[in-house]
């Protein structure tokens, strides 16, 4: 959860850093997201007169994902490591794909709001697939640590014979 919120914070920090004259720090923040997003100013939300580090659609995806991670325990148990059927992820991606395709073909003039909302839906649903994987990974690490601890304590608990060798 902290990572998703920190990611969102970094997106929002770029324009604030630039607006407050911290160009070098802003440059780094924008650069981080340059590999992930086209960052077209005309397709981005603005904060303090500066574009966010990602476009409106990417911001929607990341904000939706962060919201999905925060709300995850309200929807599913943190003990579950299974994911929903893939069709739900594809269904959630459909509005984003339609919004993009209609805008690309000129049949629909998509807006920052349509991009952000369809992206947010996709991001929120994506959390239902990522969080269980992170939970499973955490459980795997925990089991391995417990197994190592058991091996170490078992080795030290064995009694020694009089000759200094293990019995």
Question: Residues of each region from the PLM?
Answer:
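N-terminal signal-anchor transmembrane alpha helix
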Residues: 1-24
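Small-polar-interrupted transmembrane alpha-helices in polytopic inner-membrane proteins
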Residues: 3-11, 68, 83-107
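Membrane-interface helix caps and helix-loop-helix hairpins in membrane proteins
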Residues: 51, 78, 104-114
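Membrane interface segments of multi-pass transport proteins and intramembrane proteases
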Residues: 76-83, 107, 145
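Extracytosolic (periplasmic/ER-lumenal) interhelical loops and adjacent juxtamembrane/interface segments
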Residues: 16-54
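Membrane-interfacial alpha-helical segments at the cytosolic side of multi-pass membrane proteins
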Residues: 60-78, 125-135
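Short, highly charged, low-complexity non-transmembrane loops/tails of multi-pass membrane proteins
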Residues: 139-167
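Membrane-interface loop-to-helix entry segments
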Residues: 51-67, 113-124
């Amino acid at each position: 959860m902290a990572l998703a919120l920190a990611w969102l914070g970094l997106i929002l920090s770029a324009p604030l850093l630039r607006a407050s004259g911290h160009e070098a720090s802003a440059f780094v923040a924008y650069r981080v997201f340059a590999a992930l997003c086209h960052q077209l100013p005309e397709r981005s939300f603005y904060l303090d007169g500066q574009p966010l580090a990602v476009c409106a659609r990417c911001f929607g995806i990341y904000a939706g994902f962060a919201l999905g991670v925060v709300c995850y325990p309200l929807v599913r148990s943190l003990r579950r490591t299974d994911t929903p059927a893939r069709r739900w992820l594809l269904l959630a991606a459909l509005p984003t794909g339609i919004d993009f395709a209609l805008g690309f073909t000129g049949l629909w003039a998509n807006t920052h709001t349509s991009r952000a909302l369809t992206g947010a839906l996709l991001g929120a649903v994506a959390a239902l697939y990522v969080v269980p994987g992170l939970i499973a990974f955490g459980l795997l690490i925990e089991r391995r640590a417990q197994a190592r601890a058991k091996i170490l304590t078992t080795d030290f608990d064995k009694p020694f014979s009089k000759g200094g060798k293990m019995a």
